[in-house]
Amino acid sequence: MANKIKENKYIKEVLPSLTDARKRRTSEISIKDFYLDPKYINLGAGKYYMLKTYGCQGNLADSEKIAGILEMLGYTKTEDELKADFVLFNTCAIRENAEERVYGELGRFQQFKKKNPDMIIGICGCMPQEEKTIVSIKKKFPQINIVFGTHNISSIPEYLYDVINNQKKVIEVLSVEGDIYENIPVIRDHPKKAWVNIMYGCDEFCTY
């Protein structure tokens, strides 16, 4: 496998690979139903999550799914930064100012984590899909517990389980398209509006 994979007591690491990304046009995609392993049920019981979303409507749609998964785990949404047990940044890589805002927020939450070492911080979406961004995140923000890209939202329960129970940091950014998962629970931000994906993925590799 071209992706660099490293796993020990503290970290699981799968980094983006341009070589693997070029295989997107020929790789087969499977469509599966989302399934929650019983061992993940109540993983977030009594805990709070904060979800910060940047970028396009596609990210908004993904964040609604992320919220659905987290609440399925027992987490409750909060806007109180000091109350949050899990903070996840769903990011955009097209505009430089959006990336700079994320870096600024990561630095700010680093201070919160010093006061609350049990706070879990994660970053997902388009920024981690960039090779240079992963290097920057690992160097500047070692306090981040979870990093994943655009293809593996369905794995959030597994990542949280590893951080909480196995004391691991997880970096898993897939370069090829992951499987498409249907019937992921969704928490809508508006009672009469919904973001609906009409396509998934891209056959190129971001070089913004």
Predicted features along the sequence, with ranges:
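Proteins enriched for Cys/Gly/acidic motifs involved in redox and nucleic-acid/cofactor modification
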Residues: 2-208
